[in-house]
């Protein structure tokens, strides 16, 4: 039986704190681009391994670096003169040795990785020409395994690759939810169709002071859709109005203040050719941005571990961060739970469904006791440990988002 501990959290609920800060780096931010590429490569490798070998082989593609290019954005349309450089590194199984046939099966890791990276960028930064404005360099380290070991591994519970931990919390606060929904709105297909000048490089910083939430939004614009400074200001105003309307739905009862591109000056505005600052010297790296729940939350417990690109089979930095958030969300739905924090610790070499400890901390509503909630919380935690394969499968197919 798993070592599950459910206890009272002696802390002020997040909504009652006088101050709260929440951040989200949008899908076009250089750090998020790296997260997205790393995860897309992992998902693509999982698919290739399953098709060719019947099992997902060892890989970690969480080492993606982006070096910013050089561009000359201009009202009405400019040019990228030096391409963005993306380095894919990490480790992956490129060879499988079949002892019975005395032959080595070679797997197209590099081709799959580069194609996955390019396809992700093409679908994410829609105004970037992936044929000429970006260079993808694959330097993923090679590894090999024995064919017999592949099938032995597929039929057993994976062992933890490290002694590490994952962290999750639920439910999202009003500020957390609003920050996440704001970026998702501005990067939605509907908004891109309505206001094509809005780029994908969007960062949302939320500050709550009592019942007032201030959103500061850095939003790239695409120069070919902006013909004058007046048009640029109109685009900002439209984006601001959209966010203010959104806030009525997700932050009813709060005073909302929205700022867009506060660094603008008379001779400097957030204008890009492609919709991302990566075109103009802004670098990126995996794990420097959003946590596994899609947010950066300094007022909550967080893991510093990068989730994207790690293998979904036994890498604790991925599995347990995702699992902790899933368990926290389910426990938070129990009647009487105000807030839930989950921490899961592994022990290297032990089965991933047998953590050293799974710690659940609860803030309860008035009139409820932790002892009343503990059985249901235990049941939820045990269910997900027993069904960890479901989480792994959803990670393999990209169904679960990691940033």
Swiss-Prot record:
Its cofactor is Mg(2+). It catalyses: L-methionine + ATP + H2O = S-adenosyl-L-methionine + phosphate + diphosphate. Its EC number is 2.5.1.6. GO terms for biological process: one-carbon metabolic process; S-adenosylmethionine biosynthetic process. It is an enzyme of class 2 (transferase). Keywords: ATP-binding, Magnesium, Nucleotide-binding, One-carbon metabolism, Transferase. Pathway: Amino-acid biosynthesis; S-adenosyl-L-methionine biosynthesis; S-adenosyl-L-methionine from L-methionine: step 1/1. NCBIfam families: PRK04439.1-3, PRK04439.1-5. Belongs to the AdoMet synthase 2 family. Catalyzes the formation of S-adenosylmethionine from methionine and ATP. This is S-adenosylmethionine synthase. It comes from Methanococcus aeolicus (strain ATCC BAA-1280 / DSM 17508 / OCM 812 / Nankai-3). The lineage of its organism: Archaea, Methanobacteriati, Methanobacteriota, Methanomada group, Methanococci.
């Amino acid at each position: 039986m798993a070592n599950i501990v459910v206890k009272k959290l002696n802390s002020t609920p997040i909504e009652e704190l006088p101050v709260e800060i929440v951040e989200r780096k949008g899908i076009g931010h250089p750090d998020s681009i790296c997260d997205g590429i790393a995860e897309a490569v992992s998902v693509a490798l999982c698919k290739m391994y399953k098709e060719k070998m019947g099992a997902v082989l060892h890989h970690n593609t969480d080492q993606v670096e982006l070096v910013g290019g050089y561009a000359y954005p201009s009202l009405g349309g400019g040019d990228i003169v030096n391409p963005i450089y993306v380095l894919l590194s990490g480790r992956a199984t490129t060879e499988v040795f079949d002892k019975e046939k005395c032959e080595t099966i070679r797997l197209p890791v590099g081709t799959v990785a580069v194609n996955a990276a390019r396809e992700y960028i093409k679908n994410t930064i829609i105004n970037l020409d992936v044929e000429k404005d970006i260079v993808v360099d694959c330097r993923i380290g090679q590894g090999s395994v024995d064919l017999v070991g592949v099938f032995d591994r597929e039929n057993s519970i994976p062992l933890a690759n490290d002694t590490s931990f994952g962290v999750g919390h639920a439910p999202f606060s009003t500020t957390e939810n609003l920050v996440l929904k704001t970026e998702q709105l501005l990067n939605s297909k509907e908004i891109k169709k309505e206001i094509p000048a809005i780029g994908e490089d969007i960062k949302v910083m939320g500050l709550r002071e009592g019942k007032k939430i201030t959103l500061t939004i850095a939003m790239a614009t695409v120069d070919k859709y902006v013909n004058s400074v007046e048009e640029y200001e109109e685009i900002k105003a439209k984006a601001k109005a959209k966010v203010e309307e959104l806030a009525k739905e997700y932050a009813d009862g709060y005073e909302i203040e929205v700022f867009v591109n506060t660094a603008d000056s008379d001779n400097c505005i957030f204008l890009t050719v492609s919709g991302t600052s990566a075109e103009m010297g802004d670098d990126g790296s995996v794990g420097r941005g959003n946590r596994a729940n899609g947010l950066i939350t300094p007022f909550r417990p967080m893991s510093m571990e990068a989730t994207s690109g790690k293998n979904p089979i036994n890498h604790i930095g991925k599995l347990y961060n995702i699992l902790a958030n899933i368990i926290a969300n389910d426990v938070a739905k129990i009647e009487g739970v105000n807030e839930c924090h989950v921490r899961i610790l592994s022990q290297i070499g032990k089965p991933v469904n047998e953590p050293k400890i799974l710690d659940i901390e609860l803030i309860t509503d008035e009139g409820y006791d932790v002892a009343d909630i503990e059985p249901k919380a235990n049941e939820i935690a045990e269910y997900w440990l027993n069904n960890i394969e479901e989480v792994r499968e959803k990670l393999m197919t990209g169904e679960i988002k990691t940033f």
